[in-house]
Amino acid sequence: MENNFRGRYRPASAESIVVANYIRYETLAEITNTAFAGSNANVLNVYIDLYQLFRKMYRSDVAIGNRSSVAAAVVNMCIHYRAFYKKYYGVHTRIYLMQTSGPMLMNEKFYPDYNHTNIEKMMLADMITTFMIQNTAILKELCKYLPDIYYIEGPYETSVMINSTIMDRTDNSPNMIISSSSLQYAVPVFAKDQTIVIDHKWVENNIRYRIVDKYNALIELLAKYKLSDNTIKKCVNINPQLFGLFMAMTRNEHRDLYSFNNVSNTLNIFNHAINRHEIPNAYISPEYTEMISLLAPDRTEELVNRYKAVDLTYQTELYRMSNNYLDRSWDVNLQDPDMVKLLNEKYFRDNPIDIDRI
């Protein structure tokens, strides 16, 4: 459930929106001691959902800076997290900056209105869009020279790209995803290594956060929806591997996936079907249409398409067959302090990078 930590930040500019999303050290310590208690790992993979962060900038009241101001704020955020884990836990961080570029075509293929509200906002905000293109281009170039900081982008949900990146890792190191997107909640459920999502936000000078893991993903989703305890109790025996199917049968308004059925009825349908052994209490592929038809016999085709649009496993399979996945140009780790210093002087004179703590 949500935890609170007092603090202050009120976004006024694009870069201040990034700064406002830094998780302070007191809160990081609380999260780390709770989520990774007893871990002997010496490396932590940190995934930062830039798309979810940057979408907050497409508002008329946000002032924009220069072509590197947001890039500097993001890199300093990475340094902020790296310095914390190095100083207090002796743990090295590999940091992945995940960004969705353009429309999410593989989601739209099955649900044409997918994420159209966010896309329209970006298309109408020409000045902010140009500003962000400049900043992300500089950020992408800079990451090549920063030790173990990577910039990955593509026309896919960041949760899909994160899930795929975790699948490719072979060292069993734990993963922490920093994002306010509920779609990320499915990643810990299917990850082979310990993975958590930190969903945090500032509300009236307080930081509120929830820690999502492979066991509580559905419970935390319903808590985020601010549903009653009685409704939440209905999901306690439902395997979180049904997360994607549950979302397809309900809603995700941030991606314009509008209501198919209400939450309480959906949970009743799930529990009934599981208890009668009509469906397994485990992951069901969207390809199993006969089984899915038992949940919505009059709207099976619509449900299957919605499910294909939001299901993490299905979308990850599509991503891993794409040219975006095959393109490994992001996987560059030149570790060139002189080049970092040169780029800092060239692009970040007004917004310097804290290079001494990299």
Located regions from the model:
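Noncatalytic, basic helical substrate-engagement surface that gates or grips nucleic-acid strands
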Residues: 10-173, 190-203
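Hydrophobic, aromatic-enriched interface-forming segments
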Residues: 185-186
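Non-catalytic nucleic-acid-binding/docking modules located in mid-to-C-terminal regions
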Residues: 7-13, 35-45, 83, 87-96, ...
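Conserved RecA-like ASCE P-loop NTPase motor core of nucleic-acid helicases/translocases
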Residues: 177-179
